[in-house]
Each structure stands twice: as structure tokens, then as C-alpha cells.
């Protein structure tokens, strides 16, 4: 969906919404077959192609644009342009797999976890006595896991939280002489984070392999859980959550 309008005074406004429900049988970027096998999340047989959520794209995405130019000077040959872009989106699909090879397919990375009920946790064999309670608490604070107790996690069925970001651009164009002009620009990416360090932050999964598993000679699993794992999401501290500024200078002739 998209709506846009240019007003008589030169103001341009645009707003749009995209919805995506994409599925595939393999979302892994792999140059060799072994990686495609080892990293593609599965329930049982990695050689069996199963249609499931694709990891790519945002499920919901709202965008908005506002731009305005002012012409002035002799013969209105100088132009100042100010524009902004805003995005609000929910995407970042991910899944939960065991830290271990529970299905004996040779990969410790691709086995989707079973989300146990409270009573089932009490019947599981854990490596330490506190693991059961810590796993119970972790499941209960996670909306996706809590909603799928007694079922397996879906391939890329979980979504990261909503994120919002605004970019701002300033352009000053100066005409120097016939067919010659100088343009100076400033881009501020994630402008909200410049105004407030708590704005424009992106959250990411804290751990996508929350449950460890080892199989003994008799085929019985022993589970483990990291006691330091309290919450599903943490803030991404890289540049994606930080404001950035860049300058541009262009001479046209």
C-alpha cells in the first residue's frame, strides 16, 4: 500500500506499508553442499525438503518520506533541500536449535528444539539441578516459546521485536556560473539515536541455541541450560544501533 502527494509549495509526502509472508525449503547462503546441510534447521531429516518460513525480509514494514526544497537568490538559482526517511518494521526471523546433535545427522547446529511443557521439564535429565528451573523461566519470558509449549520450534518461526529508525538529509546547491554548481550535503543516519541514546536501537536474539544436549551410548539425552541466559533479546551494540553522519561535496560542470 502506498500514498503520496506533492503540494503546491513543493512539499512531498509519502507513506507505504508492506506485508511479507515468504516461505522456502532452504534459506542458507551456502557455497558448498555441506554447509547447506549443516546449517539448514530441520526436525528430522536434513535431506527432506520441507516448506517453512524464509529467514529473509520483514513481515511488517512501514515507511514514510518527507521532503521540501527552497529556491532563492538571484533568479532563484540556489536551492536548499531537507528530507527525512522513517522506517518502522518487524522482521529479523530466527529459530531455536539445540547446541548438540540430537538426531545424529552429524551437525550440532541444525536440530530444531522441542519446547517442553512444565511437566515434561520435570521428567528431563539435566546436567545440573538448576537447569530445569532456569529453562522454565526462560520459556515463560519468551512469547514465542511460551506459545508453542508441547511443540517443536518452527524454522525461522520467531521474530525479533519492532525497530524504528529515521534518517535525515540536508542538501545545499549553489550555482557558481553557467552550467557550474557546487553541492554540499549532510546525511544523518539513525537521527533519533543522535537526539536520545535510547532511540533507534535494534534488538537481536541473545542466544539461538539455548538448550544443550548430549547423547550417551544408549541413546538417552542429557540436557543443559546456560544459567546466565535470562532474556531472549539484547540490544545490538554495532553501528546498526548507532547514529552516523556523512558529508558530501560535489562540483558539477
Regions found by a protein language model. Name each.
Residues 1-75, 81-90:
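Gram-negative outer-membrane beta-barrel transporters
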Residues 29-40, 97-105, 199-209:
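Flexible, surface-exposed loop regions and adjacent strand-edge segments
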Residues 58-62, 162-166, 241-245:
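Residues that define the transmembrane beta-barrel architecture of outer-membrane proteins
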Residues 81-177, 183, 209-233:
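Extracytoplasmic gating/loop element in the C-terminal half of outer-membrane beta-barrel translocons
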Residues 196-253:
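C-terminal beta-signal and terminal closure region of outer-membrane beta-barrel proteins
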Amino acid at each position: 500500500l502506498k500514498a503520496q502527494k506533492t503540494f503546491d509549495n513543493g512539499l512531498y509526502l509519502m507513506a507505504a506499508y508492506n506485508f511479507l509472508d515468504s516461505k522456502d525449503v532452504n534459506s542458507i547462503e551456502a557455497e558448498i553442499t555441506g554447509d547447506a546441510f549443516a546449517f539448514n534447521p530441520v526436525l528430522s531429516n536434513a535431506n527432506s525438503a520441507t516448506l517453512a518460513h524464509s529467514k529473509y525480509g520483514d513481515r511488517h514494514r512501514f515507511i514514510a518520506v518527507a521532503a521540501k526544497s527552497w529556491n532563492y537568490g538571484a533568479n532563484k538559482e540556489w536551492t536548499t533541500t531537507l528530507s527525512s526517511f522513517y522506517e518502522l518494521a518487524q522482521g529479523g526471523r530466527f529459530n531455536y536449535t539445540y547446541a548438540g546433535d540430537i538426531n545424529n545427522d552429524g551437525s550440532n547446529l541444525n536440530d530444531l528444539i522441542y519446547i517442553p511443557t512444565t511437566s515434561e521439564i520435570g521428567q528431563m535429565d539435566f546436567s545440573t539441578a538448576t537447569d530445569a528451573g532456569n529453562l522454565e523461566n526462560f520459556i515463560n519470558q519468551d512469547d514465542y516459546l511460551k506459545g508453542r509449549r508441547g511443540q517443536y520450534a518452527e524454522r525461522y518461526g520467531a521474530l525479533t521485536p519492532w525497530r524504528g529508525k529515521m534518517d535525515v538529509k540536508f542538501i545545499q546547491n549553489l550555482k557558481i556560473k553557467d552550467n557550474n554548481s557546487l553541492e554540499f550535503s549532510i546525511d544523518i543516519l539513525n537521527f533519533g539515536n543522535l537526539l536520545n541514546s535510547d532511540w533507534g536501537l535494534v534488538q537481536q536474539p541473545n542466544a539461538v541455541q539455548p538448550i544443550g544436549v548430549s547423547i550417551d551410548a544408549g541413546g538417552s539425552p542429557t540436557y543443559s541450560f546456560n544459567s546466565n541466559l535470562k532474556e531472549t533479546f539484547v540490544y545490538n551494540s554495532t553501528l546498526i544501533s548507532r547514529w552516523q553522519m556523512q558529508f558530501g561535496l560535489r562540483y558539477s560542470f
